[in-house]
Amino acid sequence: MKYDFDTIIPRRGTNSYKWDTPEEENVLPMWVADMDFRTVPAIVEALQKRIAHGIFGYTKVPKAYYDAVVRWFDDRHRWQIDPRWIIYTNGVVPALSAIIKALAAPSDKIIVQTPAYNCFYSSIRNSGCELSANYLVYRNGRYTIDFDDLETKAADPKAKILLLCNPHNPVGRVWTPEELWRIGDICLHNGVFVVADEIHCELVYEGHDYTPFASLSERFRQNSVTCVSPSKAFNLAGLQIANIIAADEGVRRRIDRAININEVCDVNPFGVIATIAAYNEGSAWLDALRKYLWENYEYLCRFFEQRLPQYPVLPLEGTYLVWIDCRASSIGSDAMTLRLQEGQKLMVNSGTLYGPGGEGFIRLNIACPRTLLADGLERIAHVLVQNF
């Protein structure tokens, strides 16, 4: 079946955070991490059938939901999940906050490999904990982990949790099994618990493989929890559904209690139905989506090579979020994003949003029809050329 990712679907006037936050109609948003594509037809059909029923009371999560999650991760990623390990919740960010509150005390340190997803910082701050930054090393156009520094950070008695982002947002790395083994061994040796945010796990490109951290060994499985969701891969963020995979029963009880205390345990019927449909019937659509996203990335790379060669585009191993090195510009990334918005009516994210190490970079969402991507790149070129 051929899927259409080229048609522009108008999103203004739908209360879209991405499209309706800018007040001016001609602003092109390439910032928030959701996609400008219609989701899987089978998901739409399942939701329409449920809506036609007309009653939307409290939701019980059925066995079919757990079966769909278990089957998907076994078939796609060779990860065998016991359904008892699954804790459903209404989003990965609420899950991260609940996990930190369950497993760390105020003033404890949380290790983050920076630059990193901005909500990591708010989850740490809102839990009364302290950030411990393990800076990623940017060398020869690629990021790697500073394992010596990670050893030092993990050896701190106050360090309790490592927030692992895989695939990594915003730098686009998909950590290799070897890298994950080193992370896991360091954390085990120092009594640091791994919280793996793997929400982008379905969006990995040819030549790279997503390895669930918890799948590597029994020891890692017991010393970690994993947060996953169909929201990024299937464009379902507004339905607010996610899962925490926690193999250790004691850890699971603590997290479950924190989720209930923080009142993020209830999910809506549409998120449940969409998850079942996505995992049972979305595989072919997802494969077509990944192909289209990769072609978008190749288009962007050609554009920069021809028009903006002084600004390196980082390799995209996973996610649909491109990290661009703009340090050759005469202005910082905050000023650049402001000029893009005010002068070119284009919204992208400044690297400073992602914490230490992000200055001088911008993040660009390429999950859109290619005509919109081409429009956005022309707007970027206007500012980058002027400020070189």
Range-by-range predicted roles:
Residues S127, P157, H189-N190, F220, ...:
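Helix C-cap/helix->beta junction micro-motif
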Residues E45, E218, Q222-W294, R302-F303, ...:
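Conserved core segment of the aminotransferase class I/II
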Residues A102-I124:
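Conserved PLP-anchoring active-site segment centered on the Schiff-base-forming lysine
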Residues K2-G91, A98, A278-Y279, N387-F388:
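N-terminal small-domain helix-loop-helix segment of the aminotransferase-like
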Residues S330-G332, R339-V348, Y354-F388:
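PLP-dependent enzyme catalytic core of the Aspartate aminotransferase-like
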Residues I276, Y292-C301, V313-C326:
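Conserved glycine-rich beta-strand-loop-beta hairpin in the small C-terminal domain of fold type I
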Residues L136-H208:
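Active-site phosphate-binding strand-loop segment of PLP-dependent enzymes
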